[in-house]
Amino acid sequence: QLDTDLTAYLICAQEAARRMEGGSDILFIGSMSAVSQKPGSSIYIAAKAGIEGFVPAFRKELAVEDIKVGLIEPGFTGADFQYPEFPPEKQRELIGKHQMLRAEDIAVAAHFMLTQPRRTAVSLIRVETRLEHP
């Protein structure tokens, strides 16, 4: 799991940065799991915490080349593949109760991060549900 959830991020990021020109952006999608640390998924949490540690250092390394690096950490977000215990109708219910995010919520954060002036660095956005989820 670390190979997929951490090592792949690092390898892809380093290769992308090598090919990029100034004025580019790298946007990582991490997870609130890095900070919420719920039991039962310690390896996944370790991977996401690794990304959370990697991104600020990587941002500093690439800043002089005018490559911005940001991290979005979504909370509980609806997805068919991730939560088999929450079928689509239950996810719609939780979204309606403000207890689950939609992918569009993360896209809004990404758009905000990527459309800021080059002089600014929105380096971390945490997107959480307004109310606690089950």
Each model region followed by its residue ranges:
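A hydrophobic alpha-helix adjacent to the NAD(P)-binding/active-site core of NAD(P)-dependent oxidoreductases
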Residues: 1-2
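Active-site helix of classical SDR
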Residues: 13, 47
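Alpha-helical segment proximal to the catalytic Tyr-Lys
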Residues: 18, 60-63
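Active-site loop immediately N-terminal to the catalytic Tyr-X3-Lys motif
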Residues: 23, 36-42, 98
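Residue(s) in the substrate-gating loop at a strand-loop-helix junction
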Residues: 31
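C-terminal helical subdomain
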Residues: 71-72, 90-134
